[in-house]
Amino acid sequence: MTYTLNDWFGAKVTAAKTGVLLNNEMDDFTAKIGVPNLYGLVQGEANAIAPGKRPLSSMSPTIVTKDGKTVMVVGTPGGSRIITAVLHTMINVIDYGMNVQEAVDAPRFHQQWLPEATNVENFAISPDTRKILEGMGHKLGNPQPANHLAAILVGAPSLGGKPVGKNRYYGANDPRRNTGQALGY
């Protein structure tokens, strides 16, 4: 299950008698064509507010399976950066053989087409690489506020790791925000 507030404290309104924060998911519709939303996404007529429509959303709670068995669960808040952060983590575990915490900790970059800039985390690339990319015409933006990714790997701390015991879960929590904690058993 996943839920979005969209922005810190959502719409900044709570449901009467419950204290449950209401989201501001309406920001994911195009309120005014060509004007960026909270996350800098510039949207058009196709995402205009209209009856019966669903807002554009990047929510991506992800379960990775192999041979019908769950091997990894990963998710994060972060608006337009969600898909990028989830994909980076999956690639780091599956293709680069990182353990789940290394995969979550690894530097990330994000490109969303509009605005035309690639946001790169500090220390993700060397100053020389930055200079080369900018010399090729790439626009490198400053890092955006961090996602707070969490991931669980089932069976071993990495896909290449040797399973220890039965039904072990290895959790990883993103150090970019000082919130939450992941534990495994």
Language model segments and positions:
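Proteins synthesized as precursors that undergo proteolytic processing into mature forms
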Residues: M1-Q144
